[in-house]
């Protein structure tokens, strides 16, 4: 894996190519690039796979279950020397953020995702030729340094009411 100009070695972990494409698009024009990516195959033991990889400064984990798994194994705010960042939406990931095992968390708006998904599916069921659409949804970003369980938990839970 090549090191970027700033010397930070960041590994992205995902099993969803759509999420990876989103990261690539977001980085376009920023002068940043992905130095290493691990595409997780179904049922693959990702922690075993990580033992084979080079040391990283940060892991960006785009799969909520994997983020929980790595977050549980993190010690002193790091997983094998790497800070953890990722996408998650469970109370467990919020607790891991509060504890300091995860440094940054992106939380998609689960209510909006569910509502719009059902609306599109209903449109397709009711009208055979209806063309289903994709949507951009809202999300919240929480950083460990700015996160306080008492204040921010309500904001997190609000998107799931």
Give the predicted meaning of each segment:
Residues 17-23, 35, 39-96:
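Hydrophobic alpha-helical
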Residues 1-10:
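A conserved helix-loop-strand patch within extracytoplasmic ligand-binding domains
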Residues 40, 88, 109, 139, ...:
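Residues at the C-termini of beta-strands that transition into short coil/loop
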Residues 7, 112-161:
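Hinge/cleft segment of the Venus flytrap/periplasmic-binding protein
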Residues 9-26, 114:
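Extracytoplasmic ligand-binding site segments that recognize negatively charged/polar headgroups
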Residues 2-3, 28-32, 51, 71-75, ...:
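Sec-exported extracytoplasmic/periplasmic mature domains
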Residues 1, 14, 99-111:
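Short beta-strand elements at the ligand-binding edges of bilobed clamshell
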Residues 17, 64, 108-111, 115:
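Electropositive phosphate-/nucleotide-binding environments in soluble metabolic enzymes
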């Amino acid at each position: 894996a090549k090191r970027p100009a700033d010397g930070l070695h960041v590994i992205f972990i995902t099993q969803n190519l759509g999420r990876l494409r989103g990261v690539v698009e977001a980085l376009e024009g920023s002068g940043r690039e992905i130095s290493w990516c691990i595409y997780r195959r179904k049922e693959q033991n990702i922690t075993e796979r990580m033992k084979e990889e080079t040391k990283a400064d940060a892991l960006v984990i785009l799969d909520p279950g994997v983020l929980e798994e790595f977050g549980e194994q993190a010690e002193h705010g790091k997983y094998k020397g790497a800070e953890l960042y990722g996408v998650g939406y469970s109370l467990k990931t919020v607790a891991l953020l509060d504890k300091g095992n995860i440094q940054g968390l992106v939380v998609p708006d689960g209510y909006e995702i569910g509502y719009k998904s059902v609306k599109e599916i209903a449109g397709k069921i009711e009208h055979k030729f209806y063309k289903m659409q994709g949507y951009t949804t809202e999300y919240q970003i929480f950083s460990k340094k700015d996160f306080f369980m008492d204040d921010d938990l309500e904001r997190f839970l609000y998107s799931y009411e």
